Every structure is written in structure tokens, then in C-alpha cells.
Amino acid sequence: MSYAYDTIADIIRLAEENNISFGDVVLRYELENYDRNEEAVIREIEHRLDIFEMSIQDGIAYTDKTASGMSGGQAAQLDCQSPRFMSEIAYKAMTYAIAVNEANAKMFRIVACPTAGSCGVMPGAVKAVADYYQLDRATVVKGFLAASGIGNVVANRACVAGAVGGCQAEIGTAACMAAGAIVEMMGGTPRQVGHAIALCMKNLLGLACDPVAGLVEVPCVKRNGFYAVHAITASEMALMNIESQIPPDEVIEAMNNIGRAMPAALRETSDGGLAVTPTGTAIAERVQSL
């Protein structure tokens, strides 16, 4: 049989019909459509997981400021302290996500998942959960497979670029991927993965992409920390059988429609939002003079 899918509903249906997980459907689709065996697919995913680890380490270890002076050292500042209010998982997810985006801002190697501007959410949330529960590599690989299926659906049916759909498309997709990965890793059902996606995306619709000075630093770096925790919140709800009234595919469609209705000033042009505040404008002028 074919494991082709166009929607989240397709993946859920295929998983339930074959009594397999959400991530297993994505794996079988890969094997069915590309000239690779399972070992090769897993090896490629493990390579990306290794880069997750390296980018977290780089972001924490290298504390110098970026050329713009807007970021650098914040992940290390969090890493050397203990949380006052947050759980250990949430605090680590926030720290790791910021670390990866600081690494990105300094041109270290990262995995764009789905974009460079949102590259911290998946590594941050997934590593925090995997470390806390001491999950093995095979389990994390399954989570990565689920996340890749989610990203494929959003990219093909909507958009993942801030220039097209605002930051809701970038950080929103990243958070959905992370939430789905966590549910998969924790043994959740395909339907719970779907609800995690819907709950996650619903609660960031309309988010603008307004980078100061056109750089992927403000508000991007700290925003990754916030939305790594958001992904964990969505996965927690879904695993507790809290359901979204709006199905995931309809939420994705709504995101796409909202994004395309946004003015260009709020879609990565730096012509609106935080980028044109007095402070944002002054930073842009200073950066341009460097």
C-alpha cells in the first residue's frame, strides 16, 4: 500500500489503519519514495541530532557578542543559574533554544527546522525532554520523523517562511514540529500528535516577523526560548487528552490565510513592528554604519 500523505489527517489515518505511530508513517513514506533504506534514513537523522547537540554547546560556550551587539551570552547566563519558577524541562528547553539561535547569529552550524530563524525550538524542546526522561536515541529519532512529517505538510499546504507568512509561519511551524515530536517520543497516539499541532499553532496565529536591522537576532533569539516552552505546553495538554476544537489541517490553513493577509511590513521586511520603533531604528542605523 501507499504511505503518501498530503495532510495531517492523512498521516493519522494511515497510522491508525496500519496500527503504527505517526512517525512510522513518515518513515515508510521516505522508504517508499526515495532511494534509501531505513538505516540510511536513520543515519541522516542521527547526524542532524548530533548537530543539535553541537549548536547547543556552541551557543552556551561562546559568550561573545555578535557584530551587531544585540545577542550573545544569554544562553550561558541562563545555563549557569537555576530556575525560580519554571520546571527543569521548561527551563532547559528555553536555555537550549536560545543557545542554538545565538549560535546561528554567530554563523555556527545549525539545523534549519524548518528555518534558521526558528532553529532553536526543536533542539531545545526535544533535548530537554529526552534528557529528563533519559530517552534512547531510537525514541528521539522517531520524534524527529514525526516532526519532519509535520514540517512537510505545513511547507506544502501553507508556508514556513517569515517573508511569506510572518513569524507565525516560521516559529509556529517549528513549535508544532517540536510539540509533535515530544508527543511521539512520549508514546502518544497519532491523534494526540494532531491535537498537539493544532493547540500549538492556534495560540500563535498572527505573530509578526519584524526583525530589528533585518538581522535574525531581535526578537528572534529570545522568541525561540519562549516557543520551545510553548511547544512543551501543547504536548503536555495533548498527552492529557485535551483536544483542539479546530482540526490541525484547518489551523494550518488559517495560519496560511492570516499570513498572506498580513501587510508586507510585518513579513520580514523590517518595515514595521519592533524594527521601526525608535530604539529599533537607532540600532539599524548603528549596524548599517559598521
Per-region residue spans from a language model:
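Generic N-terminal targeting/processing segments that precede catalytic cores or assembly contacts
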Residues: M1-F108, Y132, N241, P248-L290
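Alpha-helical support elements that line or immediately flank enzyme active sites
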Residues: P123-Q134, A179-G187
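Glycine- and small hydrophobic-enriched segments that form the cores of compact globular domains
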Residues: F85, A112-C119, D131, L135-D136, ...
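A structural-propensity feature for long, helix-poor, extended segments
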Residues: L145-A181, N203-H230
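Functionally critical mobile loop/hinge segments
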Residues: E184-L290
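Acidic-glycine-rich active-site phosphate/pyrophosphate-binding loop
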Residues: S87-N104, T139-A158, N203-P211, I246, ...
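Conserved phosphate/anionic-ligand binding catalytic regions in large, soluble enzymes, centered on
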Residues: M107-A125, A169-A174
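Alpha-helix capping and helix-loop boundary segments enriched in small/acidic/polar residues
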Residues: R84, C113-A116, A138, G162-E170, ...
